[in-house]
């Protein structure tokens, strides 16, 4: 498996080149960032050269379209999706991800119908660039009632929804935090096939009852109570060999420097991967 970073949890990084250098110096394999913005700043050849210089891959981009709101906003975002997909492909990226909130103010059946069609269109656009779409189920209990109506928050419901979307390039963004807050087990992971997983996020949780864990209160791998060695061992067992990327959402910005935080990430990754026998 390939060890990756997002900017989330790494403090006040000044620019993408600093992010790439920090990740490379700490021995990571990939970063997730905005491919279109990088190309706009450095040019296509300059952006490619940056990844080559730092011996990194672009793991995933975020889905840059508002698929949860009204139809006008969705349609207006389609050109940006095409541009983002083209930029990602130029940098060798084959993954694009979005999250699915576990509740909604819209009537859930109608929202499901709209979202299914919209995400199918997104998958078709991405597929033209040979990019996969990862859907992230979101587990923390407090978000299940943050809006009026319950929606989807389990892995199985998300897999069923992926089947309904019906495009071969759609799969899971599997986040260890949401695996934990759904009280899922290693056995649940071992039932997956590697092709069902588009991307993986790694982080840890404070020692709290599962129904009290907040989405934006995450900690670094190896510093909490999630069975990350079991999580990683199960992924390895089913044959998943792709990106495992840190994402640390916190209620306030870290006070440590980006250099210190990346080293903290490196230490945490080494700890949990070693404990998983990897």
Residue ranges and their predicted role:
Residues 1-94, 109, 116, 120, ...:
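N-terminal pre-domain/capping segments
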Residues 8-10, 34-38, 63-66, 101-103, ...:
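Active-site beta-loop-alpha junctions enriched in small/polar residues
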Residues 21, 30-31, 121-225, 276:
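Acidic/histidine-rich catalytic cores of soluble enzymes
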Residues 33, 60-61, 94-100, 132-137, ...:
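Short beta-strand segments at enzyme active-site cores
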Residues 64-80, 100-114, 212-219, 254-258:
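Surface-exposed, active-site-proximal loop segments in enzymatic domains
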Residues 88-109, 134-144:
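Active-site groove signature of glycoside hydrolases
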Residues 205-210, 217-219, 241-255:
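Active-site clefts of carbohydrate-active enzymes
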Residues 224-237:
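A short, acidic, amphipathic alpha-helical segment used as a generic capping/interface helix at domain edges
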């Amino acid at each position: 498996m390939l060890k990756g970073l997002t900017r989330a949890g790494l403090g006040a990084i000044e620019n993408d080149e600093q992010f790439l250098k920090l990740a490379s110096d700490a021995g990571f394999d990939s970063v997730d960032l905005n491919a279109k913005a990088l190309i706009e700043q450095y040019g296509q050849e300059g952006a490619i050269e940056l990844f080559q210089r730092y011996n990194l891959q672009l793991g995933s981009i975020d889905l840059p379209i508002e698929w949860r709101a009204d139809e006008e906003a969705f349609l207006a975002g389609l050109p940006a999706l095409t541009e983002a997909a083209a930029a990602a492909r130029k940098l060798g990226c084959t993954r694009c991800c979005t999250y699915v909130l576990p509740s909604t103010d819209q009537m859930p059946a109608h929202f499901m119908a709209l979202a299914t069609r919209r995400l199918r269109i997104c998958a078709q656009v991405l597929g033209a660039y040979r990019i996969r779409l990862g859907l992230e189920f979101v587990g923390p209990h407090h978000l299940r009632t943050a809006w009026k109506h319950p929606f989807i928050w389990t892995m199985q419901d998300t897999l069923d929804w992926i089947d309904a979307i019906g495009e071969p390039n759609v799969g899971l963004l599997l986040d260890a935090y949401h695996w934990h807050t759904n009280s899922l087990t290693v056995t649940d992971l071992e039932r997956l096939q590697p092709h069902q997983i588009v991307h993986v996020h790694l982080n840890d949780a404070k020692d709290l009852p599962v129904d009290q864990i907040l989405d934006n209160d995450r900690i670094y791998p190896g510093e909490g109570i999630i069975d990350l060695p079991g999580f990683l061992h199960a992924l390895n067992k089913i044959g998943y060999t792709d990106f495992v990327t840190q994402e640390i959402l916190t209620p306030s910005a870290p006070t440590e420097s980006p250099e210190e935080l990346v080293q903290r990430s490196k230490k945490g990754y080494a700890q949990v991967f070693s404990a998983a026998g990897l």
